[in-house]
Amino acid sequence: MSTAVNTIRCSLLLLGLVGIYTVWISSFRNGLFLRNEEFAGKGQLPGTPNATLRTHFTGIDTLDKALGIFVVFYWPVCQGNLRSLSLIAFPAAVGVGEMWILFALQFSQSNSPTRAMGKMAMFGMGLMLVGPGIFLPIYCSLDLSSTHRLDDSPSSAAEGHLCRNLRSCLLGGYYILVILLALPSPAVVSYGSKQGIIALLQGWPLLVSAMLWLTHLCGKDRTADFQATLSTARTSIYISAMACATISHLVPLLISLLADSSDICPGKVFVPHLAWPSRRVTSVEEGLLRFFQWDYGLGSLALLLWAVGLHIQRRQQISQGINYLRLIPEALFLSVMMSPCGAAALYLYRHNSTNCASKTGDKSGSG
């Protein structure tokens, strides 16, 4: 493994340690988690005094209590009481979906659909339960040492079927639920229904994986040249991931830049607050703003470093040089213009194109 890739792996591990402090430890020290537990214990929802917390979701007491805590935690995000929180929550929600689907493409390279979908489900639950700011840097660091072995694995019709259904299943099992959360309450969606949607979202990776499994069981691949359709499916996913990440990044950024209010200036929305031990939050909304700034920021940066690492790794495997003086400023520029998630999708698209060109060259040479 090259020095550059090793440096990226070490940087990812360092990001994971930073995430443990800024996302978890800091949230304990600044009072966010304590306030969350207080609201859950009283059966109240922060910022909505006329609504009560649901106590029944699944009928299993332990699971219902855990889901109630998650509902209280995410409730201010979908109510829009703090505009800066809404602006950072939009790219964060889209970013989590794009993080998942970009890794799902890597998992689908396994010849076993069951194994691939199992990895998708576990990876997604890791994102939800641990948080992308902690889970993703550590996972990406470990993954860089093994993912390259999948690049030359033979494609299968099952892999093509998974890739063609990834986007539609993610839309139905995740993004539609996120859109429903953005609808006003109680005018359009009742308080109880919105709490149920938040609870359901905690297991969206399992839901999306189950939808993929059903499409795999019910669908039959009638395409003779699945290699061509697989390449098309991958390309469309990378392009849509770039588009979604870029739009969700630029829209809040432009709103923040053009707004007259200093409360939603870019520095207060997108720049993480320093996690000083003595700095307490005055509300759950303020604590969530800090939480998402660090969690989404570190997670998206880890995704970009992982994608760049794969790009470097593959180019070195096929004996192509890397111009680091060009690569570093290019990655920084793309991060500003497209978001780190969008830039990661672009580098993964280049990585996939390099793999396809390499395989085509190998087949031509062997023919």
From Swiss-Prot:
Keywords annotated in UniProt: Glycoprotein, Isomerase, Membrane, Transmembrane, Transmembrane helix
BP GO annotations: terpenoid biosynthetic process
Transmembrane segments: 8-28, 57-77, 85-105, 120-140, 169-189, 197-217, 239-259, 292-312, 327-347
Localization terms from the record: Membrane
Leading EC class: isomerase
Glycosylated residues in this chain: 50, 352
Segment forming the signal sequence: none
Enzyme Commission code(s) on record: 5.4.99.-
Domain of life: Eukaryota
Main localization category: membrane
Pathway assignment: Secondary metabolite biosynthesis; terpenoid biosynthesis; Mycotoxin biosynthesis
GO molecular function, a single term: isomerase activity
Membrane-topology descriptor: Multi-pass membrane protein
One GO CC term on file: membrane
Recorded family membership: Belongs to the membrane-bound ascI terpene cyclase family.
Biological role: Terpene cyclase; part of the gene cluster that mediates the biosynthesis of the neurotoxin verrucosidin, a methylated alpha-pyrone polyketide that inhibits oxidative phosphorylation in mitochondria and thereby causes neurological diseases. The carbon backbone of verrucosidin is synthesized by the HR-PKS verA, and further modified by the other verrucodidin cluster enzymes.
Name of the protein described by the UniProt record: Terpene cyclase verU1
Native organism: Penicillium polonicum
